[in-house]
Amino acid sequence: MVFTSMNTQVRVPQPPPVPAAVVNPTVVTPAGPHPEEIDEAFASSHELRKRTSLFRDISTFILGQASQPSAEPAAKKRKLEEKTTSQSAPAAPGGSLVSSATKAWRTYPGVSFSIPQRKKFTLELLDKKDGGIRAIGASGNVEFSIAWKDVDQVFCLPIPEKAKKQHNFVVIPVHGDGINPLPEHLQGAAPEPIIWTFEEATGKNIVEGEDPGPGPMAEAIHHCLIQAGTGKQVIFPDAEEFASATPESHRKGDKAYHVKAHRGSKEGYLFFTSVGILYGYKKPLAYFDFASVNSIAYAAVLRNTFNLVITTQTQEIEFGMLDQADYAGINDYVQKHGLQDASLAAARRAKKLNVNKPKDKSNGTAPPDADDAEEEEGELQKAERELQDQEDEEEEDYDPGSEGESEGSGSDSEDEDGGGGYDEGDGDEVEADDDEMEE
């Protein structure tokens, strides 16, 4: 038999202990309504002592908010918010160049840009009339763009001193040549050029049947320019315009189309093209179309180098340390386009009508048709007439009484205009009249 002690107490099972609420160590639990320290601090002002509980509640709330960890990093959260905002924004009617929702006609991923940002982007071409060029970042947003209607010129020029063949596409915007004064509506903020690099495929990267050079990309841009109705095309270097006397330093078999020059302390390259002179590729770029050039002169001509001075309507820009070997080629280019004569500047500005129209030749140097020649001739005649009117006004202001006071005053202009002294025929007639008088 089993005996149970009378003094043994039967243990009743206890429920599991309830865990105590976790108290945030950073949150200070407020004490009584008026601790002794507060009573002593506000002994002279009972109204302020009554408001201390409100300030304790506010501080407790702020400490509680600060102690809660963020669900994700701030940078990641910001990117997601930006992406959501851009995707939720409705697209403009008919599509928009700056809207990533607008589909591109051509896409080129991983393109290296140097201006306005030195970074790789996806290059996109939109071939509609309201299309243009845009760069897409890694997040899918449009980083920068330019409409076709705002494009002044597009160049495809070789990058000098490279072992592999590389080319820079240079887009000059309207009012972004870095030379001419800006119109008032731009408020001093000139549009920036766009430059990206194209590297020719070599070796295993060459695709059979495809042009490894920049030709296909240039043709795509040309197509878009035609669709937009700009009448422009991509300008390539042309040996008929200018080619350096020194071949490429890293590729002896290739012609060089540049001349190394300094603008101040910065070194760059001058390109003499069929539409003007471009200086690049570092900021600030400068593009001199023929209409903006008043005259071109030479300075500091030494045995090995010389300086080129380009005068515009508003300023004079000097490029230094040009190789003397390229002097003859540059001078031929200047003479060919009449850039050495400031008196022809008005005629050059008059020629700036339908400039850089699509030509039969790829380099854009083919002669215009008969209708364009007649229109251009009319503008030239107008410019000549304005110059003649100006000369006539100067002759009207001339004082004949001062002719004998200065030696040779006005003799050159009189000989050129044929309005001064007698020619040989007139002299013979005068002598004949004198003989008749004597008889």
From Swiss-Prot:
Alphabetical list of InterPro entries matching this protein: PH-like_dom_sf, RTT106/SPT16-like_middle_dom, RTT106/SSRP1_HistChap/FACT
Q: Which GO molecular function, any one, fits this protein according to its record?
A: histone binding
- Feature: compositional bias, Basic and acidic residues: 379-388
Primary residence: nucleus
Q: Which residues form the signal peptide?
A: none
Which stretches are tagged as biased composition: Acidic residues? 369-378, 389-439
Spell out the subcellular localization from the entry.
Nucleus; Chromosome
- One GO cellular component term, please give it: chromosome
Name the UniProt key words of this record, in alphabetical order: Chaperone, Chromosome, DNA-binding, Nucleus, Transcription, Transcription regulation
SMART domains tied to this protein: Rtt106
In this UniProt entry, which cysteines form S-S bonds? none
**Span list, region Disordered:** 66-99, 352-439
The UniProt similarity line reads:
Belongs to the RTT106 family.
| Complex formation | Interacts with histones H3 and H4.
Q: What is the protein's known function?
A: Histones H3 and H4 chaperone involved in the nucleosome formation and heterochromatin silencing. Required for the deposition of H3K56ac-carrying H3-H4 complex onto newly-replicated DNA. Plays a role in the transcriptional regulation of the cell-cycle dependent histone genes by creating a repressive structure at the core histone gene promoter.
This one is known as Histone chaperone RTT106
Q: Which gene underlies this protein? A: RTT106
